[in-house]
């Protein structure tokens, strides 16, 4: 039930051979066995962890240090991939629907009641629309463009299964309803789609032209009838400690996805380090507010955060934030907005004079809270740490880009401050 091909990367064999084959290589008997096995495993997991409400079906992501999300390349998977517009999502959704049908059959049974489940149990079997599955398997015209309905959503395509015949050749078989109509590929009961795209520009919103391709993918998935989950990205993962200007776009993206009935959002940020600079804490706060109510006023929320997070140091920290954003916008043609980029550093992006100016702003910020040392030491420590976290980025630039302008003692001080 896995791909029988592989590629060789810089670290040796990589994970194409370990990608799941969602068609069972076109073998009808093996496919039925695969569906039964996965459905039984899902039901078994549900019994062990009855409070879990979502189970994901996805491709493998990163194995042996290689970022390889290629799909299975057997003849059946390649046929499905080509048929649905260069996406493996058609095969994935078909398989997920078949699994869900069997899980639903169990949940509607007397046995499920005896096991302590009701027929309306909350359970989402989630197709991860990621990698080569990010494009929806929807109706397209002769040149491959998506055909949207009047509401601007994708329209379901006819359902085909890709089955090996007696000669071993793969045949595409159109599925028919009992009334003779073509069956459509839609999300069955309890099937949910989670959209996750790592190639979008997350310093821009999905309303903007830079992300039109990805916005259209979301609109396409929204037409297939299932819930929409969203996995968003909020940092450049190749340059983790550099600022990523996704504050306003984060809010606009939440509003965009809400328009298409998204019910769950995971904003992946600096999860490996809880104390990154670049105003990661502000981004987390924005998520905590706007994920529950997209109608807040962005400016008012940002103002509230700065006043309460930095107290008397707010004017200096807000000036730093505003200038940081202005510089990022001005240099966006050089840095881009990708989350896997090495273009964020350099003297042309961060002039030394500007960095030194920001360091002086931090000195003023520390001085503004100095009086709390005596009057409220606990508050002082909190505010001091909040400022210190944000000071990491300009000091990082001085210690790396401009390291040659300091002696060893000075660099040691910068790194330890």
Which ranges hold each PLM region?
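Glycine-rich, aromatic-flanked loop segments that form ligand/cofactor-binding clefts
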Residues: 1-14, 54-59, 122-126, 268
